[in-house]
């Protein structure tokens, strides 16, 4: 059964951390819905290599419409974490025991949502102290799968491992 993947994304996301997983998800015939503040917006990655058209506003997004959540890294998670609507969405997604896929800086959004305590995730150089203080259990490896719920990767260099693991989870 093909899965429905929500992507929380706004300006300054890490280009490859959006484009490569989304391309792989679509190639495996999963649907992808880009969510931001307003449907119809166009957001750009840090390297300006790609633009993303927003399919649905956060106000119209329900966790019940999706099977998994992707949060690309870059500066996007820092912008999203100051908006309670995105924090609420992530918190309820985690509480519903649905898989969350995160690259590099995206765990800070889960930290803001209060759903990182005791979770095993990969260690990102610039955020590891904050994540440790929030109670995350950090690992310095390419990808970490915490019970098929939290799948994380350190950086764009680890994307092949990340994509492989997320596709396994989507096939379940």
Residues of each region from the PLM?
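Anionic-ligand binding patches
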Residues: 121
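Catalytic nucleophile serine of serine hydrolases
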Residues: 104
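Extended, subdomain-level signal for the structured scaffold at the beginning of enzyme domains
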Residues: 1-100, 109-117, 128-172
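Glycine/proline-rich loop-helix segments at beta-alpha junctions forming the active-site rim
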Residues: 124-126
